[in-house]
Amino acid sequence: MQKPRLSLGQIGNMSFGFLGIQFGWGLQLANMSAIYSYLGAKDSDIPLLWLAGPVTGLIVQPIIGAMSDRTWNWLGRRRPYFLVGAIFSSIALFIMPDSTSVRMAAALLWVLDASINISMEPFRAFVADKLDPAQRNIGFVMQSFFIGIGASLANALPYVFRYAGVSGTTSSGIPLTVQYSFKIGAVVFLLAILWTVLTSKEYPPEDLAAFERERAEPRGIVNLVGSLIAEIVSAIRDMPATMKQLAFVQLFTWLGLFCMWLFFGLATSYHVFGATSPQDPRFALGGEWGGICFAVYSVVTFLVAFVLAKLANLTSRKTVHTIALLCGSVGLLSVYFIHDKYLLLLTMVGVGIAWASILSMPYAILSGALPATRIGIYMGVFNFFIVIPEIVQALTFGRLIRALFGDENHNAPLYMVMAGGIFMACAALLVFRVQDVGDSQP
């Protein structure tokens, strides 16, 4: 089916929900470790407490992808999942800062991450469903744009409340600035998704009669689950060559990102602010500045998102992604040479450029290599190459750090940030071997 060209406003409407999704992710990334600590978790417990994200991504995304490929009702194909995920995500976000125990917070995080994945997974397929191949670059870049805005707002909101004079804590010791931010985040998440659901329509399956006949076949729950698993296995077995090549790019890219997310704040405290222990007042100052740095790279992300789309049209998606990953690599490696907090902000420019490309170019490249009837399932399987390295890192990096650097080496976080830069450089080199079948550029 020849799809009509959509206006920039229409593409913005269909991507606006990502602002809410990233608002939820941003609040989680910036605050969950601290929430666990306030509730009494030990530092050594935190990596395992973070397993909710990758495990739910590993399980939920391919299942939702396969289910959404088979769905068609009055809301469409993907939008029912946007809405269901948003409702449960908003509930979890609203309750999270009122947690009274580590177990309660951990349980809510599992609900939150599963629900966010329900909303997020169909968004990638939504772009491929709605847009002609010539517009997919701008479609995925528009998602990056709203991701950048959502993350920037989420990172800044607790600081806004603090400077507005909000102080105090809940009965569990969680700052009111965090509590208010999560509750606002719950509202933003739901409203952003509702905007996309209400302003964007979907195209029915090309052969609706055949689609309805297949869906009408009686299936028990066991057969349904079995068929979904069989479809996931089939998708992995029949994975297009481009997807296999991108898998290695994603593996090294996300190892680099996880090194940054887990260790950048600590590296800022010890290396730039000169803290000698977590009890040192400079440690907290460094952690706060690390949050500001993350806000900066989020701002850079939405500022450069559309520039990357234009450059991809002028050159190629592979060229843009390679250069962007190298920018991120240089940004992380350069932290070693920086001891001034303001110069540290410059490193985030490179990271922001890389992040804008990471959120768009691999998906634009992938969408051109996928059969239209299986885009949802393949987008879910593609998520494996993000969550598997995260699971491996959560389970092994603590032991690796102790083996290489010991427990008391405050340079270890800096070295792990630099390792993230090396991983990103490896990812950039691997882009050269990717075959972009949907790009007219070389």
Regions found by a protein language model. Give the residues of each.
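Intracellular juxtamembrane helix-capping segments at the cytosolic ends
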Residues: 118-131, 357-371
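Helix-to-loop junctions at the C-terminal end of transmembrane segments
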Residues: 59-75, 303-316, 401
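C-terminal transmembrane helical hairpin of 12-TM major facilitator-type secondary transporters
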Residues: 312, 316-362
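Intracellular loop-helix junctions on the cytosolic face of multi-pass helical membrane proteins
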Residues: 1-9, 100-107, 118-119, 123, ...
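Hydrophobic core of transmembrane alpha-helices in multi-pass small-molecule transporters
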Residues: 92-96, 100-119, 343-357
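C-terminal ends and interior cores of transmembrane alpha-helices
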Residues: 82-101, 326-339
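Loop-to-transmembrane helix entry
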Residues: 42-52, 176, 180, 274-299, ...
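Helix-loop boundary and gating motifs at the non-cytosolic
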Residues: 2-54, 244-249, 253-278
